[in-house]
UniProtKB/Swiss-Prot annotation:
SUPFAM superfamilies: Prokaryotic type KH domain (KH-domain type II), Ribosomal protein S3 C-terminal domain. GO terms for molecular function: mRNA binding; rRNA binding; structural constituent of ribosome. The lineage of its organism: Bacteria, Bacillati, Bacillota, Bacilli, Lactobacillales. It holds the Pfam family Ribosomal_S3_C. Part of the 30S ribosomal subunit. Forms a tight complex with proteins S10 and S14. SMART domains: KH (SM00322). Belongs to the universal ribosomal protein uS3 family. It comes from Streptococcus equi subsp. zooepidemicus (strain MGCS10565). Keywords: Ribonucleoprotein, Ribosomal protein, RNA-binding, rRNA-binding. Binds the lower part of the 30S subunit head. Binds mRNA in the 70S ribosome, positioning it for translation. GO terms for cellular component: cytosolic small ribosomal subunit. This is Small ribosomal subunit protein uS3. GO terms for biological process: translation. Residues 38-106 form the KH type-2 domain. The keyword Repressor does not apply.
């Protein structure tokens, strides 16, 4: 089960929280499409800013967007010019008041999305897929990860038949629900077609917070 299911989706409500924090009844579809439009726009505008997670919260006529990025200076811009322009564009896109929070990622080598993005960009620059994966694994393990697994799929080295090849180091316990496993999937556009890049990073165990019951037990 743990090998097949999405590692983050399986842990939501246990050790992970939702990336979208809002509730709706009749407007659910509209909000969902708006969320997708916001995420697509931000990923396009900030493609070079190493943005990993985008969290969206909603209040009455207000949207709070939290950007987790390894390059906060690039997102903010000189004197806050870039973030102000982004806020204005999102206000126009949604027709609501958008607030942007910027959260710095202290260790980008422990973020699966950024590691996968780095491998994908190297593959686009014709770096050998084995070398790109092994270098990423070394950097992640040096950053303090307990384990990492990577996989690249597609027409590797321009081969006629697509295949998958992966490497791993340390342990990646996908069945253990308290294991803090970050997962990401990225695409690399090469001259031979698209290559898929998958990354699993095990960052250690997280013990779920105990819930208070009646009588304080």
């Amino acid at each position: 089960m743990g090998q097949k299911v999405h590692p983050i989706g399986m842990r939501v409500g246990i050790i992970r929280d939702w990336d979208a924090k809002w509730y709706a009844e009749k407007e659910y579809a509209d909000y969902l499409h708006e969320d997708l439009a916001i995420r697509k726009f931000i990923n396009k505008e900030l493609a070079e800013a190493s943005v990993s997670t985008i969290e969206i919260e909603r209040a009455v006529n207000k949207v709070i967007v939290s950007l987790h990025t390894a390059k906060p200076g690039m997102v903010i811009g000189k004197g806050g010019a870039n973030v102000d322009a982004l806020r204005a564009q999102l206000n126009k896109l949604t027709g609501k008041q958008v607030h942007i929070n910027i959260i710095e990622i202290k260790q980008p080598d422990l973020d699966a999305h950024l590691v996968g993005e780095n491998i994908a960009r190297q593959l686009e620059q014709r770096v050998a897929f084995r070398r790109a994966q092994k270098q990423a694994i070394q950097r992640t393990m040096r950053a303090g990860a307990k384990g990492i697994k990577t996989q690249v799929s597609g027409r590797l080295n321009g081969a006629d038949i697509a295949r998958s090849e992966g490497y791993s180091e340390g342990t990646v316990p996908l069945h253990t629900l308290r294991a803090d496993i970050d997962y990401a999937w990225e695409e690399a556009d090469t001259t031979y077609g698209k290559l898929g890049v998958k990354v699993w990073i095990y960052r250690g165990e997280v013990l779920p917070a105990r819930k208070n019951t009646k009588g304080g037990k």
